[in-house]
Amino acid sequence: TPKTWNEKMLNDEHLKVLYYEQNSAKIFNNTDIKGGVVITYHDREKECGAIQIFTAYPLLNTIIQKVKKQIKSSLSDIVFAPESYKFTKQMYVDHPEILSMTMISKGKEVPLISKGHDYDLTSNIFDKLYNIVFFETKQGADECVEIFGRKSNERVCLYVNRKYIAKHPNLDKYKLFFPKANGSGRFGEVMTDSDIGEKGVGHTQTFISIGAFDTREEAKNLQKYLKCKLARALLYVLKVTQDNKKSVWKYVPLQDFTAHSDIDWSKSVAEIDQQLYRKYDLTADEIEFIETHVKEMA
């Protein structure tokens, strides 16, 4: 459903949820509906109070409200979308032949670069422009950067002339790379491992990136934070499908990942979770809920 419709429903004072089942197959045999099945009731004569944030668990609602009161910035503020990296016009100045190249798709000859995607680092761009602008080794004397993506179903980094990649806030910073499609959206599941992006490395649309750090240590600390149960519990409030878009990170608080943080990042993931529980003043019941509903990541 459209975002505007969802927001309208969540802020409707006359709407309430009567029933929710996350596993749609329990309601409709052999049917997988991402996000589950919900039955709502609307009474225009009665005010029920706006839902605002919907979760299947009452304890999770109280956790969200506690954390929200202390959130100054959200992790979504430093999440960069799959489409955030772009080509420059210079690539086509140096390689005008790309615009006239074709390929066979579903038995038809089509342009190599799809209409409207001239500057996009699409998920299959390595296969399309391999040994044209993307290479396994540096070419010539021009300065190169690396792009992280997939080629022949494997994660790889390929070199490209720096002048062919548009300026980006985290290209020359440390960051994390996550697949743009990750997991199923089931609450508490384990996430696919992230990769630390070094300085001078960007990504194709197969990935999102998080952070623009001056030090590698900050990226490592973020990586540890995202293995924490509390962070993932808050992520899966909005991440109800495999889609790993920027907006689903809204309720995950941004932390200070430097050595000056109020969190001791040298500790284990489990010990960091305990620090976070204290920071957000969670009760024993709230902690038990997270510990029993969110799978461990070491």
Where are these regions (language model features)?
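C-terminal substrate-recognition regions of SAM-dependent nucleic acid methyltransferases
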Residues: 31-204, 211-263, 267-284
